[in-house]
Amino acid sequence: MASVPAPATTTAAVILCLCVVLSCAAADDPNLPDYVIQGRVYCDTCRAGFVTNVTEYIAGAKVRLECKHFGTGKLERAIDGVTDATGTYTIELKDSHEEDICQVVLVASPRKDCDEVQALRDRAGVLLTRNVGISDSLRPANPLGYFKDVPLPVCAALLKQLDSDDDDDQ
């Protein structure tokens, strides 16, 4: 005598089938971007050159995705973005840039007390092709930063503590 599947098993099978159908439909959606570039812009409140626990993320900072042809250096694509309340920007891109070098670059800070561009933190490279072994469309970019005009009072003690922690590791 054949056994009747338990209701939980049947429900799980139906849910699994629906998930597969919906994911296939979403994968074929021509309106979805090929790539989603995401990163953050911060204010280096200690002028340390890196993110600390007193770093502030900047809402309303302007960034630009620039893709330049590898051989000629000609600008092939530029897309502007703006950070949200958490200092996070999201830029959607519809096509691949296999022959390009793409970087997100700082454009402007809305904070007058934190608008000095940090060398080496003013741009972040992103790979925008599928031919590099990355199948996910989300492409995270390294954080971009500006220096605060005057370090916060807590910074001297914080940087001393960080230096002391480094000495303990040796």
UniProtKB/Swiss-Prot annotation:
The protein's recorded glycosylation sites are N53
Q: Which PROSITE patterns match?
A: OLEEI
Annotated protein name in UniProt? Pollen-specific protein C13
Keywords, comma-separated and alphabetical: Disulfide bond, Glycoprotein, Signal
Annotated tissue distribution:
Pollen.
Source organism of the structure: Zea mays (Maize)
State the source organism's domain of life. Eukaryota
- One GO term describing the cellular component: extracellular space
Q: List the disulfide bonds.
A: C43-C114, C46-C155, C67-C102
